[in-house]
């Protein structure tokens, strides 16, 4: 029996959850056909999902047929919850991409297609709502071939064991040299060759129907069952985590797919600490790894679960007892995943109202544990909590979750652009912390990294100079928080922080001393870089695809240039023109409404996060932020030295005159 993990993805309102219900009902896995608009869909297990009629959280369902055990992961379709969807892609064997026959390919559908390509997920396509008056099968197929791939081929009839897809066999053969050779030799293509082409993402079977009316569902199930193949797994244990949640009793659930070997309850697990998490000194070993024992292993289908003793490779399960896991992490042989493509570019300020702000912070930390992209930050000097969100609908959901789960009635201020900071050249930072009966000095090298790499950490300090335990502690302090830049107080990124040298006192040094010295060293280095003009402000950019009527392309081009964006040579078919390029989020965030207005609803704009670039109006943003790094006492660049039995502060620019260790990087000595 084949064991397959499949995700179902779609633009919002394409009928994704309705198709999931139809698949469950057709295969006899549910007795009653639920409906999203009736609030009784099998996979919409959350109250908010039933109220809003949209999928917010990825939920599993087990579909069993005589030849297939299918774990179906129903993912969110709304763009604000795309991060939840993207995290799921790393555990999929196949994807089912649902497209509305009435609307065709939408902007978010194109984003999904690009993500499926990036994660190399073989894809079946179900064109839904074919009962709608506007649905045109020929037109939709042409659109799929033009916008996605020539490998998008109608598989109507593929469920029949005797069918050979005769009408499209030549089209299938044209997608692969091997398939063409076989077709020319025998006049047909065997099922195994078709399975291989689908797995290699050169062939994308397309099915048409109406999930609500149960039309085309049997055909799709049979075709899917016929043309998928089970992945091969080895005996070495591995697992990939795609989600963290909490059940109604408050138990923390780590959702994962086993990718090798067997996973048993009560197994001792280990993994790499997540950057930005303070693990506590007793929770991490010298290599920066956590070690915890799994408790229960649960296999879910909808809201119900079965507790099992073990699961085999290819199984999706939820595990209790783990507190240090995070979405995207690998266990066993699996490495941690890559940085997600879809990331929030807006930051919001919590307005606690009459609620205790620290209680709000604790609640938001739990939500951040489930969704690390929230990036909850406490700003002590402002006594504010900031978090990052994808958009207004996610903000409303967070607000409702704060009320429903924690009893906190809060609101949020208007969203602002999430800026980041980096440096242009290497610099050595020095931090010294020596109040009476305390002692620590840290030297770190800050180096720029290529755009999009994020933060990296290392040590080149000799253990003859500083004990390994202290070095481990310093690196932990580098990782455990999101360090802020000195231009606008925005998070730093694309930077490598290397421990060069440090000093401890045999009698007076305590664990917290190196935390202070390390934080101050990083900030002092950033201030040195700012003094030299080496700090850079970064802003998020969108990659966009803009389709407008031909007579309006001039308007669109002028808009993009005005927004400091760029685009490739326009392309089109005569009636419509397409512009593809990049532009700052700050300029393009509300442009979809403008497009809808000047094209009278005929234009389409799709945007996807394209990374951070140098800010196009950095001086203006820095001035508006009015950030003073020397007044930010929670992130001070200054040091504390001791003389005559008392500690005294030393400004960052005077630290080199007082530091106890010489510069360790030759570049500083040459200044």
What are these regions (language model features)?
Residues 14, 26, 30, 78-79, ...:
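Conserved nucleotide-binding/hydrolysis micro-motifs of P-loop NTPases
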Residues 197-200, 285, 334-346, 377-378, ...:
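Flexible hinge/switch segments at interdomain interfaces of large molecular machines
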Residues 227-229, 234-347, 384:
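Conserved nucleotide-binding/hydrolysis modules and their immediate coupling elements
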Residues 300-425, 468-531, 550-553, 586-588, ...:
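C-terminal effector modules of nucleic-acid-centric enzymes and ribosome-associated factors
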Residues 415-480, 503-505, 536, 543-574, ...:
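C-terminal polymerase-core module
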């Amino acid at each position: 029996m084949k064991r397959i993990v499949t995700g179902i993805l779609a633009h919002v309102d394409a009928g994704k959850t309705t198709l999931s219900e139809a698949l469950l009902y057709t295969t006899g896995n549910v007795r009653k056909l639920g409906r999203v608009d009736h609030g009784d869909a099998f996979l919409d297990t959350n109250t908010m999902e039933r109220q809003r009629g949209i999928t917010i959280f990825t939920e599993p369902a087990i579909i069993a047929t005589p030849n297939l055990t299918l774990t179906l992961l129903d993912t969110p379709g709304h763009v604000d919850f795309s991060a939840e969807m993207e995290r799921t892609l790393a555990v999929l064997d196949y994807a089912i991409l649902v497209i509305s026959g009435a609307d065709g390919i939408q902007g978010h559908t194109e984003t999904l297609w690009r993500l499926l390509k990036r994660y190399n997920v073989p894809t079946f396509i179900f064109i839904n709502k074919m009962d709608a008056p506007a649905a045109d099968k020929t037109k939709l197929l042409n659109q799929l071939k033009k916008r996605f791939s020539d490998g998008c081929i109608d598989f109507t009839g593929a469920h029949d064991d005797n069918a050979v897809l005769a009408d499209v066999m030549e089209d299938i053969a044209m997608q692969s040299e091997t398939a063409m050779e076989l077709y020319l030799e025998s006049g047909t293509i065997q099922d195994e060759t078709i399975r291989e082409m689908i797995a290699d993402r050169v062939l994308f079977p397309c099915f048409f129907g109406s999930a609500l009316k149960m039309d085309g569902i049997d055909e799709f199930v049979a075709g899917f069952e016929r043309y998928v193949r089970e992945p091969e797994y080895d005996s070495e244990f591995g697992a990939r985590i795609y989600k963290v949640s909490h059940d109604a009793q408050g138990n923390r659930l780590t959702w994962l797919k086993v990718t090798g070997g067997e996973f048993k309850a009560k197994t001792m697990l280990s993994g790499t600490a997540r950057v930005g998490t303070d693990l506590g000194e007793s929770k991490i070993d010298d290599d920066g790894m956590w070690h915890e024992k799994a408790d229960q292993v649960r296999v879910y289908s909808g809201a119900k679960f079965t507790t099992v003793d073990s699961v085999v490779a290819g199984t999706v399960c939820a595990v209790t007892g783990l507190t240090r896991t995070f979405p995207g992490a690998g266990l066993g042989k699996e490495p941690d995943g890559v940085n997600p493509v879809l990331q929030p570019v807006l930051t919001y300020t919590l307005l606690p109202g009459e609620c205790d702000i620290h209680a709000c912070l604790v609640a938001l930390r739990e939500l951040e544990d489930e969704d690390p992209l929230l990036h909850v930050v406490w700003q002590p000097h402002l006594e504010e909590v900031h978090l990052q969100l994808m958009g207004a609908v996610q903000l409303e959901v967070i607000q409702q979750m704060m009320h429903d789960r924690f009893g906190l009635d809060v609101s949020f201020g208007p969203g602002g652009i999430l800026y980041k900071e980096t440096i242009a050249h290497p610099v050595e930072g020095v931090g010294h912390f020596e109040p009476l009966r305390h002692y620590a000095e840290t030297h770190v090298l800050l180096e720029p990294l290529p755009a999009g790499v994020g933060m990296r950490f290392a040590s080149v300090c000799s253990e003859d100079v500083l004990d390994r335990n202290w070095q481990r502690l310093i690196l932990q302090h580098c990782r455990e928080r999101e360090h802020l830049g000195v231009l606008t107080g925005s998070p730093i990124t694309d930077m490598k922080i290397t421990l060069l040298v440090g000093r401890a006192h045999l009698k007076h040094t305590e664990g917290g001393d190196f935390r202070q010295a390390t934080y101050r060293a990083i900030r002092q280095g950033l201030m040195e870089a700012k003094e030299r003009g080496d700090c850079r402000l970064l802003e998020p950019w969108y990659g966009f695809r803009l389709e407008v009527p031909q007579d309006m392309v001039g308007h669109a081009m002028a808009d993009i240039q005005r927004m400091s964006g760029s685009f490739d040579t326009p392309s089109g078919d005569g009636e419509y023109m397409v512009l593809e390029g990049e532009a700052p989020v700050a300029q393009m965030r509300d442009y979809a409404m403008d497009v809808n207005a000047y094209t009278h609803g005929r234009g389409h704009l799709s945007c996807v996060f394209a990374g951070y670039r140098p800010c196009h109006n950095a001086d203006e943003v820095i001035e508006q932020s009015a950030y003073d790094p020397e007044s930010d006492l929670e992130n001070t660049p200054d040091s504390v030295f001791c003389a005559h039995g008392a500690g005294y502060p030393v400004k960052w620019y005077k630290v080199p005159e007082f530091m106890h260790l010489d510069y360790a990087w030759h570049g500083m000595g040459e200044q």
